Amino acid sequence: MKRSSNLLILTASLIAKDAIRYTPAGLPVIHCQLHHDGELSEAKQIRQVRMNVEAVAVGDIHQELLTMDLGAVAVFEGFLTQKTLRNERLVFHITKITSNE
């Protein structure tokens, strides 16, 4: 398997989360929406960045997402991949959550 870099670190607020579901293999899954609002530097200019991100927590990490209140801000780490083989829309797969309080 070829290894490559695909790491996203995003400070965001949790704005929506679905109920727990389970994969056919029995892994817990929670789909959620994150909102990022901040300023970044691009080409020596300050750029306002606002976006909503579709995200999913699979496996043990779902416990942390489950206990988070809507509106809570955290640092989310994970990777991007397409939603399904046929749907190329990107989804953020969360692998780590660090409280931002």
Task: List the predicted regions and their residue ranges.
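Single-stranded nucleic acid-binding surfaces, predominantly the OB-fold ssDNA-binding core
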Residues: 1-101
